[in-house]
């Protein structure tokens, strides 16, 4: 076994200030996020995790591997407090900052190509979601899609009303055209 001072130098654990900084950073992100997903990354290579991080950045998702005790402290008092009991094993936390379904969507899409990525739980609005709930969250439309759907629903009655108003005039035109065609035929 090596000398004690060499082992201390190689110790990769965080000092107290670094731990406090990690807790503060994750707590700040959690307080500004709409939803969170906890995933187990066991079995993924560094290259695969890097791809996941790139996909998360593109989707405006905060992705962080945090020790469970530090994550528990960071989530305390936030909407994601309900996740604290399930923080066991090697977990990575993904937070959606803009859209509630962004983190779940990024994780689902990445998980299709990498089955070793396992969704453990999620949280939305202070409610704990099982893995199936995270899948349903991923299927939710984006904000732009939801606005487009709403506009379509709002436009439909107006369009129908406009066609209803135009119908008597169109019917009169068709009747006059039919009479004209009948007179020309005889």
Curated annotation (Swiss-Prot):
Which Pfam families does UniProt cross-reference here? Ribosomal_L10
**GO CC annotation terms, alphabetical:** large ribosomal subunit
Could you list this entry's UniProt keywords, alphabetically sorted.
Ribonucleoprotein, Ribosomal protein, RNA-binding, rRNA-binding
User: Mind telling me which PROSITE patterns this protein's record contains?
Assistant: RIBOSOMAL_L10
List GO BP terms, alphabetically. Answer: translation
Instruction: Report the NCBIfam families cross-referenced here.
Output: PRK00099.1-1 (NF000955)
Q: How does it assemble?
A: Part of the ribosomal stalk of the 50S ribosomal subunit. The N-terminus interacts with L11 and the large rRNA to form the base of the stalk. The C-terminus forms an elongated spine to which L12 dimers bind in a sequential fashion forming a multimeric L10(L12)X complex.
The similarity annotation says: Belongs to the universal ribosomal protein uL10 family.
Protein task: Forms part of the ribosomal stalk, playing a central role in the interaction of the ribosome with GTP-bound translation factors.
Protein name as catalogued: Large ribosomal subunit protein uL10
In which organism is this protein found? Nitrosococcus oceani (strain ATCC 19707 / BCRC 17464 / JCM 30415 / NCIMB 11848 / C-107)
GN (gene name): rplJ
């Amino acid at each position: 076994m090596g000398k004690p001072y060499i082992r201390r130098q190689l110790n990769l654990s965080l000092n107290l200030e670094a731990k406090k900084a990690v807790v503060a950073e994750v707590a700040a992100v959690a307080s500004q996020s709409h939803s969170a997903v906890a995933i187990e990354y066991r079995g993924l290579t560094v290259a695969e995790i890097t791809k996941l991080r790139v996909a998360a950045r593109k989707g405006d998702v905060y992705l962080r591997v945090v020790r469970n005790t530090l994550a528990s402290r960071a989530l305390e008092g936030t909407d994601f407090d309900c996740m604290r009991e399930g923080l066991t094993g090697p977990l990575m936390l993904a937070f959606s900052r803009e859209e509630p379904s962004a983190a779940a969507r990024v994780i689902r899409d990445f998980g299709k190509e990498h089955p070793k990525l396992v969704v453990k739980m999620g949280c939305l609005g202070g409610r704990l979601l099982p893995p199936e709930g995270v899948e349903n969250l991923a299927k939710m439309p984006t904000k732009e899609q939801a606005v487009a759907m709403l506009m379509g629903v709002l436009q439909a009655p107006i369009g129908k009303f406009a066609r209803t108003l135009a119908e008597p005039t169109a019917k009169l035109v068709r009747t006059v055209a039919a009479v004209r065609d009948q007179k020309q035929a005889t």
